[in-house]
Amino acid sequence: GREIAMTQRSASLMRELGLWQRIHDTDPAALSPLRDAKVLNGASPFSMMIGHTLTNRSELGWLVSNHLIRRAAFAEVDAAAKAHGRITLMTGQPITRVLSQGAAAAGSAPAAGSAGSAAGTGDMTEVLLADGTTHRARLLVAADSRFSPTRRAMGVGASMHDFGRTMLVCQMTHEVPHNHVAWEWFDYGQTLALLPMNDDPVTGEHRASTVLTLPHQRIEPLLTMDEEAFGEEMSRRYHGRLGKMKLTSTRHNYPLVGVMPHRLVARRFACVGDAAVGMHPVTAHGFNFGLLSVNTLADELRLAHASGRDIGSPDLLARYERRHMLATRPLYEVTRLIATLYTTEAAPAKLLRNAALHLGQRFTPFRKLVAASLTGSL
């Protein structure tokens, strides 16, 4: 349903995990380079440009379809399960209740992969699944969305910021080439984004993932509008800068709610992915932070397992929480402020928006900092 803007660091992790090669083998054209990015405000053609020339890379990042990432991840886990026999996939069975923490019922077998822990065999977390079965493990990890029911079941609260907006996402072809430049356009009354995809390998048409953000009630009519009228409407909303536009995919809508958990860990429990931080998409860091959380936690688990230490120890989980909070909390707060400022329509806010954009363009060190955050040079 949507394209993922991926930093160079995330692309590197994807390669290490074997996912990049799987996607490339399936559809090489699905890996689209994101060379530059520009930020626009209102109807002005002026933009703040974050170019790859500010870095030592030929692109800032990459654009990959979310469904291809999911498919590759499933295939990689399935292959590992068949190769090692120590992984069990139980799909479509959400956790309905966390039954216990700490000493669990005697006689129950530990979950797969719990061997090698220094903790006693009774020190486990037990969960009840929708099919009525119970399972025990030394560590329970929630990766079930920013509104994580597992996080809630563990008694971990979260601060939520509802932006009162919904974004509509779809793929479209367009006449004017995008030159692999991403757009973030804070127009008046709407926010637009363009994520550049590779040209259609069959027709040669220019393609992009387009994102339109509006108040909830104004998105609904666009979801059911006929395709020709929708193309005309989107061309108008992009002020004709992409020429004629044509819908080439289904349309998807997502309410914009930022979520920051009060904690990332509890007793024998950790949050990763969107369950660890739910970002506003304006900085395109949601997936990247999710992948970072998995890598950070995995680092801690590997070190503990290699030295025979408990993979669910309070010290290990505290280190993970500190590392990931430090990596994500500052940008979460900055993103929330940016999204609020650039959707405020009052006259003083419009002046401030314009001034900030011009200042950012003139202050090259700032643009280099943004570019470095995308390429992983920080």
Predicted regions and their residues:
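Conserved FAD/dinucleotide-binding core of flavoprotein oxidoreductases
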Residues: 187-254
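Glycine-rich FAD cofactor-binding loop and adjacent beta-loop-alpha segment at the N-terminus
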Residues: 1-34
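Conserved N-terminal helical subregion
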Residues: 23-26, 31-153, 161-166
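C-terminal helical "tail/cap" subdomain of flavin- and related membrane-associated enzymes
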Residues: 299-378
